[in-house]
């Protein structure tokens, strides 16, 4: 079985969870990883095959989402290009940890995610 594990890199929570999940998946299946979001120095034991820029959320000083900045400062043409280039069709299973590029690619390609 071939599995794609897609991880959001905002913060360290998703990546910390991945550190525990990756070895378990590798015991039972062939695993490839993609990431999206801001560059992060958190080291995964398994290197991602691809990193996408994805979508960035911008926040106000009090921690809520700044919707104006989020809407206007993301490059949606690049995002669409990333979605269309994400190879979701070559996997038997996609595990998605809040990673938007593979999720949208799976939706557009009628692949369960």
Regions found by a protein language model. Give the residues of each.
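Conserved nucleotide-sugar phosphate-binding/catalytic loop shared by glycosyltransferases and other
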Residues: 5-9, 31-79
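A short, glycine/small-residue-rich beta-strand->loop->alpha-helix junction that serves as a flexible
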Residues: 6-19
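An aromatic- and histidine-rich active-site surface loop
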Residues: 41, 94-109
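Conserved nucleotide-sugar donor-binding subdomain of glycosyltransferases
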Residues: 64-101
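Nucleotide donor/acceptor-binding cores
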Residues: 1-2
